[in-house]
Amino acid sequence: MYSIKCDDNKAMPRERLMRLGAESLSNQELLAILLRTGNKEKHVLELSSYLLSHLDSLADFKKMSLQELQHLAGIGKVKAIEIKAMIELVSRILAIDKTLTDSVLTSVQVAEKMMAALGDKKQEHLVVLYLDNQNRIIEEKTIFIGTVRRSLAEPREILYYACKNMATSLIVIHNHPSGNIEPSSNDYCFTEKIKRSCEDLGIICLDHIIVSYKDYYSFREKSTLF
């Protein structure tokens, strides 16, 4: 059975999340936030503890029907639907990550992942995916976060980790906080520079992708640089 610890000092999971971040919360607290309220017999933390104690693992959530979830947790249909929707969303996120690590990458796959990761950032972030000879990700590395004095990174910073990982190829991604994905003249110059630097070391630059929260631009798909 799933092991649960009930701690009276953790009675405010939402406040703890705001102070410490979601990763600091227990499964019990995270579930309590989703449940929002308890039922007639149990406080919300007691209810989440009770529900988790009847599972062998968190994966059991996905196997449960709406009716089973309602019956076990003593919650209404709306709350059960919300929990099932969250579980399905998490499953889809994990499916994207698995696709990226297990199979050949396409610009669309990378763009979808990075639109979710970088689309809401207020500063420019430059991320590089380092790949092996089967196009599997060796490392995903944030190389640079923009400042008012500087945007994008130098090729040597990108290539340092390529050599460290013994990568065969790489994909460069950065976001445009403005939401406009059209590449600037600096983006073109940077792409030419990193592509040339990669070629000098025998590394393949597969693509440079610009993302916003809802769209992307692939230099491989839309420019003549590749």
Curated annotation (Swiss-Prot):
Zn(2+) binds at H174, H176, D187. The keyword Protease applies. GO terms for biological process: proteolysis. Pfam families: RadC, UPF0758_N. Keywords: Hydrolase, Metal-binding, Metalloprotease, Protease, Zinc. GO terms for molecular function: metal ion binding; metallopeptidase activity. Residues 103-225 form the MPN domain. PROSITE patterns: MPN, UPF0758. InterPro entries: MPN, RadC_JAB, RuvA_2-like, UPF0758, UPF0758_CS, UPF0758_N. A motif (JAMM motif) lies at residues 174-187. Belongs to the UPF0758 family. This is UPF0758 protein M6_Spy0838. It comes from Streptococcus pyogenes serotype M6 (strain ATCC BAA-946 / MGAS10394).
